[in-house]
């Protein structure tokens, strides 16, 4: 599918690279690890609203766990992803309100969602494609499904999305993995809902609305269902949350057609 009127026109330059993988192999994944940098760390993490959306959905599994590992400013080349998924201590315990240590059962991750630094895909000197191939192969060897999360353009550099989207889709196609179009949803929301600020004051990191939009797009892509009418709004005004839910589904559904 070309991203034409249905999504975005970029200064008359039509973006026509299509994602080859339309969904994940894991049916309704129960254990997910998100790996990246501050883009998914802000607002107490993108994983938290994603988990809440899943748990508030009447049709999805309630025994759902999602973890997040981030390094500030990190490229995927900084992250030892294979060591994270093989570490038996990740998610193995918690503490109650009285400081008692509670051991938890640890199940292997079904899916790992990763993203690179904001400029890595658009810099010719970066090793974006090489490192995604490495991580994808490592994960597939141990039975974990790799997924890419397309990052978003800076608020003051909207045309970044042209190269970002192309490089993320190209990398996904090269490795036969799913790419989630969070960046395209940001671009569309910036165009359609200019009064909803998806960014913090640095014009790069997500505001609470931006984090929620990202979670809604990931939800839509993983579960192939709309987050519309989900009662979890991440503390946003209901009208804003509902607009972002609807847009997330529209962008995701059209992206995979």
Whereabouts are the PLM-identified features?
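Soluble non-cytosolic domains of exported or imported proteins
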Residues: 26-30, 40-48, 122, 126-130, ...
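Short hydrophobic segments within beta-strands
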Residues: 35-36, 149
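Alpha-helical cap/lid subdomain in secreted, periplasmic
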Residues: 96-208, 212, 216, 220, ...
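Cleaved targeting-peptide boundary
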Residues: 17-25
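Conserved SGNH/GDSL esterase-like catalytic core that processes O-acyl groups on lipids
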Residues: 31, 41-126
